[in-house]
Each structure stands twice: as C-alpha cells, then as structure tokens.
Amino acid sequence: IMGFVSGLPLLLTITLLQAWLTDENISKSTIGLFALIGLPYSLKFLWAPLFDRYVISALGRRRGWLLLSQVFLISSIFFLGQSQPEINLYNVAVLSLAVTFFSASQDIVIDAYRRESLKESEQTIGASAYVLGYRFGALAAGAGGLILADIYSYSLVYTIMSLIMILGVITTLLAEEPKVEFKSYTLRESIIEPFKEFFTRYTAINSNIKAVSYTHLTLPTNC
C-alpha cells in the first residue's frame, strides 16, 4: 500500500496535469515550464536529515512525519483539483509544487520506514513489493486518471485520487513504529556536516576529472 500511495501522486503532476492544461488551451511553452515542479523529487536530500533529527508526535519518528506529509499531500491534491487553470494558473503551479514537495517527503519517510522495519533478509522482497505498488499507483493516476477525466471532470478525478490516498493514512495509523535506537545528532552533525562533506567530495572529484582531462589532452601522440 505504501508503494501504491508513493506512485500515485507522481503522474498527477505530470501526465494528468499536462492533459488538463492542454484541454484548457494553456500554451505549450507554459506547460513546459510546469516540468520544474518536479524538482522536489531531485532535491529531497536537502530536507531529508530533518526527518532523522526531529520527532514531531507521539506516533514516533517515522510514523509522525509520515502522517504529517500524507495529510498535507492529500490536502494539496484535493485543492489542486478545485483550482481553475484558465482563471488562475499561479494557484495551479503553487498547489502542484506542494503536491510534489509533500510527495517527495512521503517517499523519504516511507523508504526509511521500510529499511528500519524489515530484517536484512526481507529487504529485497520489501523493495520488490514497494516497486510493484509504486507502478500500480502510477498506473492508477496516469491511465486511470485520464480515463476518468474523459468521462468526468478533472476536478472530480483529483478529488477521487485524494480520497484514495487516505489508504496511506490508515496504513500509517495501523503500522508499528520501527524499533530502532537513534543517536541524537546536533543540527550541525545532521545537516551542515553532510553538506560540507558532499561539496568537499564533489570538489575533489571535479578536480581529479579536470586533471585527468588536462593530462589526456596534453599527452603527445605517436604518429
């Protein structure tokens, strides 16, 4: 189920949204710009450390963050469906970005929950089940959403999808919090130091690539 609710939001802001904007006669150049709303999926590493550092509810570290992201995700999907692209495209962009942000956040926590709640021998099966559910979720939002939109309105389709996402909330409430001991990290240890290490490694790798490239270009060739 967690894989399903992870895959479902993805195509709501890609395939289904593009079809909706096209039907509303939004220009192709504007629709192309909407590809930028997918950035949170690529940049989610920026706020992922916060989910390890802070506990926000009695549900526990993982379930607390998961429930919060799911509630905001469902709300974003619902209100996106109530927006009107032909009148206020800005609202559509903001709500679409909210969907991708909270969807990416949900993915972070679900991945951590899966790794911590399964034994080492169960990780492969767990990952396979997650991917299978993810594909079914994407199929439901993509093909299923387009079929429903052809019969009903896009607003109703997004409302239906937001209601389906409640399955994730129910699963979160019924699931058990992983029994994992967490070391308490400072803000510097959990966020600043990883970034510092990342950019240090990136700089070193980049320097090595430049050095190798320079050496390769300046080596004499034998004729």
Name what the model sees in each region.
Residues 1-37:
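Helix-loop boundary and gating motifs at the non-cytosolic
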Residues 33-53:
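Central cavity-lining transmembrane alpha-helices of secondary-active solute carriers
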Residues 71-85:
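C-terminal ends and interior cores of transmembrane alpha-helices
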Residues 89-106:
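Hydrophobic core of transmembrane alpha-helices in multi-pass small-molecule transporters
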Residues 128-142:
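Glycine-rich segments within core transmembrane alpha-helices of 12-TM secondary carriers
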Residues 158-173:
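Symmetry-related core transmembrane helices of the 12-TM Major Facilitator Superfamily/SLC fold
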Residues 181-211:
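Juxtamembrane intracellular "pre-TM" segments in multi-pass secondary transporters
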Residues 215-221:
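Conserved small/polar residues in nucleotide/adenosyl-binding loops
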